[in-house]
Amino acid sequence: MRLPNILLTGTPGVGKTTLGKELASRSGLKYVNVGDLAREGELYDGFDEEYNCPILDEDRVIDELDTQMRDGGVIVDYHGCDFFPERWFHIVFVLRTETSVLYKRLETRGYSEKKLNDNIQCEIFQVLYEEAMESYKEEIVHQLPSNKPEELEENISQILKWIEQWIKDHNS
């Protein structure tokens, strides 16, 4: 049976991981957090002194994920999306969060003032939504609100319906 690949993207702190893990547990699809994958496989290409974090080796991430993506049934969670092959994803969800809510979430994570402000600016200017629109066909890119628990439930329900329909349409 063919299964869809889903990309969850958006500014850090919008709820990609929470949504992705819950969606995987309810749908049976496999969840991959690219940050965790990179950490476990040490898929890095240097260190960013300004942001105090490792730099992702995008080519190695693609090599690591390619077979799984070809097999299908994968939910990928990452705050960037322009380096993934377009053919990988059947649908892309960009999570969006109000800046006041996002600020509190990032502050709780202990982000530096610069990192915090840069991520808030990223959300204000819809940087990741625009990146998704430039990287994938417009009709597969969807924005989802991610501010409160009720929206999480609505998003899960909406995506589960989409998965069910996709499976029907591609396995008859």
From Swiss-Prot:
Residues 33-56 are annotated as: NMPbind. Pfam families: AAA_18 (PF13238). Broad-specificity nucleoside monophosphate (NMP) kinase that catalyzes the reversible transfer of the terminal phosphate group between nucleoside triphosphates and monophosphates. Also has ATPase activity. Involved in the late cytoplasmic maturation steps of the 40S ribosomal particles, specifically 18S rRNA maturation. While NMP activity is not required for ribosome maturation, ATPase activity is. Associates transiently with small ribosomal subunit protein uS11. ATP hydrolysis breaks the interaction with uS11. GO terms for biological process: ribosomal small subunit biogenesis; rRNA processing. It catalyses: AMP + ATP = 2 ADP; ATP + H2O = ADP + phosphate + H(+). GO terms for molecular function: adenylate kinase activity; ATP binding; ATP hydrolysis activity. Its main location: cytoplasm. Its EC number is 2.7.4.3. ATP binds at residues 13, 15-18, 109, 148. The gene is AK6. Keywords: ATP-binding, Cytoplasm, Kinase, Nucleotide-binding, Nucleus, Ribosome biogenesis, rRNA processing, Transferase. HAMAP family: Adenylate_kinase_AK6. Belongs to the adenylate kinase family. AK6 subfamily. It comes from the Eukaryota. Residues 108-118 are annotated as: LID. It is found in: Cytoplasm; Nucleus, Nucleoplasm; Nucleus, Cajal body. This is Adenylate kinase isoenzyme 6. Monomer and homodimer. Interacts with small ribosomal subunit protein uS11. Not a structural component of 43S pre-ribosomes, but transiently interacts with them by binding to uS11. Interacts with COIL (via C-terminus). PANTHER family: ADENYLATE KINASE ISOENZYME 6, POS9-ACTIVATING FACTOR FAP7-RELATED. GO terms for cellular component: Cajal body; cytoplasm; nucleoplasm.
